[in-house]
Amino acid sequence: MIQGIQITKAANDELLNSIWLLDSEKNEARCVAAATGYEADQVIAISDLGEYESREVAIETAPRIEGGQHLNVNVLKRETLEDAVAHPEKYPQLTIRVSGYAVRFNSLTPEQQRDVIARTFTETL
């Protein structure tokens, strides 16, 4: 478990008011901020802090990224894409976003075009 602390009293004056992240599982302390004597991100053994008093500092953990979501935004009507499938000559410049890159709709295979239409226009999220 990781705990954030600010040292309020210590035998070592360089620790006074410094902020640390303590990892009890690894028995490590990571310096977040200190006036002198310690660098930001410096890692030491918790025992190297010596005797001290502290107050807890709330920390926010970054969200875990597990898989994730992807969003392509195309501002157009379903009818426009369906008409582009039926009459590609009318839409030579129709460009859409697919997986983060721009592509001309007419350069896609018919299967890819149907997939884009199905993914772009849904009834619910």
From Swiss-Prot:
<comment type="function">
    <text>Acts as a radical domain for damaged PFL and possibly other radical proteins.</text>
</comment>
<dbReference type="GO" id="GO:0005829">
    <property type="term" value="C:cytosol"/>
</dbReference>
<dbReference type="InterPro" id="IPR001150">
    <property type="entry name" value="Gly_radical"/>
</dbReference>
<dbReference type="InterPro" id="IPR011140">
    <property type="entry name" value="Glycyl_radical_cofactor_GrcA"/>
</dbReference>
<dbReference type="GO" id="GO:0008861">
    <property type="term" value="F:formate C-acetyltransferase activity"/>
</dbReference>
<dbReference type="InterPro" id="IPR019777">
    <property type="entry name" value="Form_AcTrfase_GR_CS"/>
</dbReference>
<keyword id="KW-0556">Organic radical</keyword>
<protein>
    <recommendedName>
        <fullName>Autonomous glycyl radical cofactor</fullName>
    </recommendedName>
</protein>
<feature type="modified residue" description="Glycine radical">
    <location>
        <position position="100"/>
    </location>
</feature>
<feature type="domain" description="Glycine radical">
    <location>
        <begin position="5"/>
        <end position="125"/>
    </location>
</feature>
<dbReference type="InterPro" id="IPR050244">
    <property type="entry name" value="Auton_GlycylRad_Cofactor"/>
</dbReference>
<dbReference type="Pfam" id="PF01228">
    <property type="entry name" value="Gly_radical"/>
</dbReference>
